[in-house]
Amino acid sequence: MISLSGLTSSVESDLDMQQAMLTNKDEKVLKALERTRQLDIPDEKTMPVLMKLLEEAGGNWSYIKLDNYTALVDAIYSVEDENKQSEGSSNGNRGKNLKVIDSPATLKKTYETRSASSGSSIQVVQKQPQLSNGDRKRKYKSRIADITKGSESVKIPLVDDVGSEAVPKFTYIPHNIVYQSAYLHVSLARISDEDCCANCKGNCLSADFPCTCARETSGEYAYTKEGLLKEKFLDTCLKMKKEPDSFPKVYCKDCPLERDHDKGTYGKCDGHLIRKFIKECWRKCGCDMQCGNRVVQRGIRCQLQVYFTQEGKGWGLRTLQDLPKGTFICEYIGEILTNTELYDRNVRSSSERHTYPVTLDADWGSEKDLKDEEALCLDATICGNVARFINHRCEDANMIDIPIEIETPDRHYYHIAFFTLRDVKAMDELTWDYMIDFNDKSHPVKAFRCCCGSESCRDRKIKGSQGKSIERRKIVSAKKQQGSKEVSKKRK
């Protein structure tokens, strides 16, 4: 970590380089100076900070230019505030152990206030200067350097350029966790030789022939050697999602989604689509973690950002880099609940919960007597990852959810992974189609209006969105436009 206080002491030694950059009229430098001059920041204050950021970013301008040079402006004002504090009395400082975090993407001050009971730290968001109608004003912004708290392999910042929304309250987790009663039996002994590739070495995708783990995808790997989802597999999954009636389904005798908890009876099962799975290699396989058939297990690799949208959709997720078609983005992570636990949780909760559950129903119809502890769902309301911020978009979303088999060969439990459906440009929002039927009055998602902005929006009766923005609740289901009646009862 580099202290911003070192910027002022290094100004003289860098003057020659600064002058050279100005003399050469570097276009990128001039654009940065144009922005800071709008805020009445003199060049002699901008240049040393800019050089330090470039050094820290390895000469990469992407983060510096992000959001109209927000990182640069933040850094300049951080240096100013630090200099003022060093000149003044230390009695005015609140808290202890003042630290300056100078990440090129998100610069802010952190006051660590240690508590005897929790040892927690409190982050104080710094004021951010901006222009409004030509006038220089300061506006509060929510800015968190890494919402994952170091639990992912990449940092994922959170920003609110609108400055009107509180940071959402939830516990970030990188892996699914069992809430209470869900039956999840993960055991190497339960994985037979036919369900693993014990004789493989290194990278399975480099072998002459596909291994046993490729059996689920018709004897071919679903991934390319570049780590992307193959186009043919991706297109088939998309067709199944858009035209589910054209593909086989299985039907439950007593479907958990059609259960009336008050009467103890079951309605008719509408069928569960037999989805295409990807089976990844796992611990009993002979390959290593760099195997090309372990894409989802390696976790998030893309540069992502949680941000507050300006289209009435609340918080959203966007990419900070260009992404090719078939790129793995993240899993949908949450608590593993039984269908009954989900029903009870929704009955007890308020109507402003932030997420909807993921129903893991791909194998329900194959069971003669499906036990409640085997009818599982994922709920990211209290604990989850960045997927809880992904907004819905009708018909033309740029991501799709794919079921992934990893730890267990049965389909009571599996992973949900998101892949891009097309090339996605940096700063574009990442979206996926929840398959909501807005004409279904009993559907729980009907509680909010669709603001996706798609020309093919299925909620045509609602135009625009006004009033206070709320974080939208998310849902994905293996069924065609079906929601849990247990959830909808709570919403009535």
Swiss-Prot record:
Residues 302-435 form the SET domain. Zn(2+) 1 binds at residues 196-197, 200, 204. Residues 112-138, 463-492 are annotated as: Disordered. S-adenosyl-L-methionine binds at residues 313-315, 391-392, 434. Zn(2+) 2 binds at residues 196, 213, 281, 285. In the pre-SET domain, Cys residues bind 3 zinc ions that are arranged in a triangular cluster; some of these Cys residues contribute to the binding of two zinc ions within the cluster. This is Histone-lysine N-methyltransferase SUVR4. It comes from Arabidopsis thaliana (Mouse-ear cress). The lineage of its organism: Eukaryota, Viridiplantae, Streptophyta, Embryophyta, Tracheophyta.
